[in-house]
């Protein structure tokens, strides 16, 4: 330990663009900076300035690799860290190349090397398409002293790397609700997150043609390539639901609460291979919303055993049926929402359990 104060670092990208991992890193960094008993260090990543560059190879990203390496070398030159939290990029080729290049430098910059699997899917990649790249990255990540996962459903990722110290630390978010800001006339369905095939957005728009006409849908988030907001609006028009589908686009985090407050039901049809936790599910529970979600990755584990509406992932028909089933029991939505709010308070509210930052500090002091 560096003197009497542990030196703790976090690497990663802060918003923009908005996304679960970027927002989680921002929250962790804010929590770390608030601690007066440690020295906090941030190693910024700036690989993806816009959502349109997600998982795309660009010269900017190649140059950023060298810049991040230099930042890590400078941290080591300044005495290194007691512990560094490194975010895994995910199972796609571009994130794997990033981790292949940076993981050794991150390992060398700290006494304890901690990795966080917010981006899941490495174990599945190793099982279905075990490329040389994935195998090599798994071996490098296996040099970590500890791995943090958001849910038990993600345990396979650090296990395939050979990491023995695996700790489940769900995201914890501060309570952003306020009785004065809650809409008295909550109405309609809401989706928050990236918009694209892997997130189930096209199927959700298609499903609107088969659900009760009184249900509307609001989509808040950036489109992933090759989609655009206009393409989604054209799709809604194609299925004859454009009058009931409101495609908002991205909004600042402080603005999103107004959409949660006004909604009556949250829908999350993701089938993304990198999905690990679904931060928006915890946010929906915080706002007391009942949930329709795909039975994918950790979704069922996150929402828990309550009366929410879980459907088999990947088929629009199953999504439609889940929404129709939810609509038939609409009178129970306030009760389900209250149950979800209680689950948020016991599991996902900031301070409800040992936080990841507190765990990092304990390890750094050991």
Feature roles, as predicted:
Residues 44-49, 192, 216-233, 249:
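Glycosyltransferase donor-sugar binding loop
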Residues 8-10, 180-199, 205-212, 217-220:
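Conserved donor-binding/catalytic core segment of Leloir-type glycosyltransferases
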Residues 250-251, 258-263:
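Short alpha-helical donor nucleotide-sugar binding micro-motif in glycosyltransferases
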Residues 218-243, 254-255, 332:
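Short, structured helix-loop element that forms part of the nucleotide-activated donor/catalytic region
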Residues 286, 290-293:
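Short hydrophobic beta-strand element within catalytic cores of glycosyltransferases
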Residues 305-317, 325-331:
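Conserved acidic donor-binding segment of nucleotide-sugar-dependent glycosyltransferases
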Residues 261-276, 289:
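Acidic donor-binding loop of glycosyltransferase active sites
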Residues 136-179:
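Donor nucleotide-sugar binding/catalytic pocket of nucleotide-sugar-dependent glycosyltransferases
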């Amino acid at each position: 330990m560096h003197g009497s104060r542990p030196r703790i670092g976090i690497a990663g990208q802060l918003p923009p663009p908005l996304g679960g991992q970027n927002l989680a890193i921002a929250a962790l960094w804010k929590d770390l900076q608030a601690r007066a008993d440690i020295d906090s260090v941030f190693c910024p990543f700036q690989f993806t300035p816009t959502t349109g560059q997600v998982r795309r190879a660009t010269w900017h990203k190649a140059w950023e690799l060298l810049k991040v390496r230099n930042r890590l070398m400078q941290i080591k030159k300044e005495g290194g860290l007691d512990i560094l939290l490194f975010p895994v990029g995910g199972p796609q080729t571009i994130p794997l190349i990033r981790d292949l290049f940076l993981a050794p430098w991150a390992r060398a910059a700290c006494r304890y090397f901690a990795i966080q699997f917010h981006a899941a899917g490495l174990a599945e990649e190793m099982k279905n398409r075990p490329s040389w790249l994935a195998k090599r990255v798994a071996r490098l990540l296996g040099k970590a002293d500890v791995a943090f996962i958001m849910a038990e459903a993600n345990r396979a990722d650090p296990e395939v790397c050979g990491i023995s110290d695996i700790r489940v630390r769900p995201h914890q978010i501060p309570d952003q609700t306020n009785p004065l800001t809650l809409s008295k006339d909550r109405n309609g369905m809401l989706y928050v997150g990236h918009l694209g095939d892997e997130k189930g957005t096209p199927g959700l728009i298609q499903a609107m043609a088969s659900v009760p006409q009184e249900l509307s849908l609001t989509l808040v988030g950036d489109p992933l390539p090759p989609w655009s907001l206009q393409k989604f609006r054209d799709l809604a028009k194609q299925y004859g639901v454009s009058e009931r589908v409101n495609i908002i686009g991205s909004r600042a985090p402080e603005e999103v609460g107004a959409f949660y407050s006004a909604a009556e039901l949250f829908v999350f049809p993701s089938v993304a291979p990198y999905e690990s936790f679904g931060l928006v599910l915890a946010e929906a529970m915080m706002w007391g919303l009942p949930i329709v979600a795909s039975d994918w990755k950790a979704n069922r584990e996150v929402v828990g055993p309550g009366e929410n509406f879980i459907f088999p992932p990947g088929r629009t028909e199953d999504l439609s049926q889940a929404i129709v089933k939810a609509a038939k029991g609409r009178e129970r939505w306030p009760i389900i929402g209250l149950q979800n709010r209680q689950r948020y308070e016991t599991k996902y509210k900031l301070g409800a359990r040992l936080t990841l930052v507190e765990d990092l500090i304990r390890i750094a002091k050991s």
